[in-house]
């Protein structure tokens, strides 16, 4: 079994380097908005139809959470991801060093083969948030438990080492095991479903959160975190897409929201090129509601999330929500009214504008992005009369196989 999986991984990595960016780079879709909300119950249980297709939003068949366009795998639903529960219970050994990599990969392979169709070409998102693969990134009480458990594990496994050597061994063994779990899982997914876009949710991180700071908030990513992102070259090499989070922090002032989103996306664009000759596609995760109040995002909020993502040149935005959105007929109607009245019209506007700019400036062989990322007023929007803009503030990011200022030059 071990040799078989190892061979599959090598073959899969070769396949994925050939096929890595097939999905959201077709000329017809320079920017996509993807639905990652389990809303199937609205139609099935309450008779409320959510017209996602008519609004230009990409969804799975039947609006199911897992399907041909997007599937997200949580910590307790995929392989043998090790973590500690809220009461300190160790699941799958608790720490990466304590889980069998071979058993994890065997179980993950079974789940991939049975949950994703053989022609799957959607987004495959792994949501593993309990620990960070670099030792120094596990700060705060929630994550420090993994450092403490690693030290205990090392003391049990290597009792002959002195305390300083045990601490060093805990550090290195944690990082080696964490890397193996994440790297081999991505390679396995890309082997078995090579047309899918595989990556981890919330990677890369940025560390530019809002903590009631003074008026000098810039939105820049924390220097220590950008350094760690550079150290994670192996993760970007194994990924075929990046899924950073642009969830707006509670009470983040409107004046700072664009800077918050922009710098998170710019960091993703930076790491997208670290291990690839052509950048990985970036699809930012956004929410439908504010975390603190539960209010739906306003039109201004949508501009600072979806609008900024399109203007900076991402491949798309993934809209996330949980089962609460479809938990009752009333909530389904609220979601319907928000879709039809606010979200849907804005998505139609942005996706049409992105397509028009792609064809007018980039000959349909690339997507438009701001010439100056900090030009806050430059958006891919249709005019109020639905006419096209001049797009003078945008340049082209060419798709793989094309080059030049307007993506007109074939590139082998």
From Swiss-Prot:
Single GO biological process annotation from the record: cellular response to tumor necrosis factor
UniProt KW Disulfide bond keyword: yes
A Pfam family annotated for this UniProt entry: Glyco_hydro_56
InterPro entries, A to Z: Aldolase_TIM, EGF-like_dom, EGF_extracell, Glycoside_hydrolase_SF, Hyaluronidase, Hyaluronidase-3
Glycan-modified residues: 69, 216
Keywords: Cell adhesion, Cell membrane, Cytoplasmic vesicle, Disulfide bond, EGF-like domain, Endoplasmic reticulum, Endosome, Fertilization, Glycoprotein, Glycosidase, Hydrolase, Membrane, Secreted, Signal
Position of the signal peptide: 1-22
Domain called EGF-like: residue spans: 353-408
Molecular-function GO term, any one: hyalurononglucosaminidase activity
Name of this protein: Hyaluronidase-3
Organism (species): Mus musculus
Gene: Hyal3
């Amino acid at each position: 079994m071990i040799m078989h999986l190892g061979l599959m991984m090598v073959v899969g990595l070769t396949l994925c380097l050939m096929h890595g960016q097939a999905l959201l780079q077709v000329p017809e879709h320079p920017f996509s908005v993807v639905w990652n909300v389990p809303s199937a119950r609205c139609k099935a249980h309450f008779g409320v139809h959510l017209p996602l297709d008519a609004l230009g939003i990409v969804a799975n068949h039947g609006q199911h959470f897992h399907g041909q366009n997007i599937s997200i795998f949580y910590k307790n639903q995929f392989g043998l991801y090790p973590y500690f529960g809220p009461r300190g219970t160790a699941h799958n050994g608790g720490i990466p060093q304590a889980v069998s990599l071979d058993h994890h990969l065997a179980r993950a392979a079974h789940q991939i083969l049975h949950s994703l169709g053989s022609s799957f070409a959607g987004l495959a998102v792994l949501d593993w948030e309990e620990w960070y693969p670099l030792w120094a990134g596990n700060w705060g009480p929630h994550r420090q438990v993994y450092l403490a458990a690693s030290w205990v594990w090392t003391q049990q496994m290597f009792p002959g080492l002195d305390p300083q050597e045990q601490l060093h061994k805990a550090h290195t063994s944690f990082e080696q095991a964490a890397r193996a779990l994440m790297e081999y899982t991505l390679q396995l997914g890309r082997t078995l479903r090579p047309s899918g876009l595989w990556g981890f949710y919330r990677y890369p991180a940025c560390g530019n959160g809002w903590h009631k700071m003074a008026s000098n908030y810039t939105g820049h990513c924390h220097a220590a975190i950008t350094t760690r992102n550079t150290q994670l070259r192996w993760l970007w090499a194994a990924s075929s897409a990046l899924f950073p989070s642009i969830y707006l922090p509670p009470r983040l002032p409107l004046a700072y929201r664009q800077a918050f989103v922009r710098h998170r996306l710019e960091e993703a664009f930076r790491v997208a090129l670290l291990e690839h000759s052509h950048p990985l596609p970036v699809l930012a995760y956004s929410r439908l509601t504010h975390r603190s109040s539960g209010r739906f995002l306003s039109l201004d909020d949508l501009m600072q999330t979806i609008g900024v993502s399109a203007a900076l040149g991402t491949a798309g935005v993934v809209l996330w929500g949980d089962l609460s959105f479809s938990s009752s007929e009333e909530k389904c109607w609220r979601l319907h009214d928000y879709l039809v009245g606010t979200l849907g019209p804005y998505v139609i506007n942005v996706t049409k504008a992105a397509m028009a700019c792609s064809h007018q400036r980039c000959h349909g062989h690339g997507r438009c992005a701001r010439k100056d990322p900090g030009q806050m007023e430059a958006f891919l929007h249709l005019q109020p009369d639905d006419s096209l803009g001049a797009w003078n503030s945008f340049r082209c990011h060419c798709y793989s196989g094309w080059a030049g200022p307007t993506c007109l030059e074939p590139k082998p």
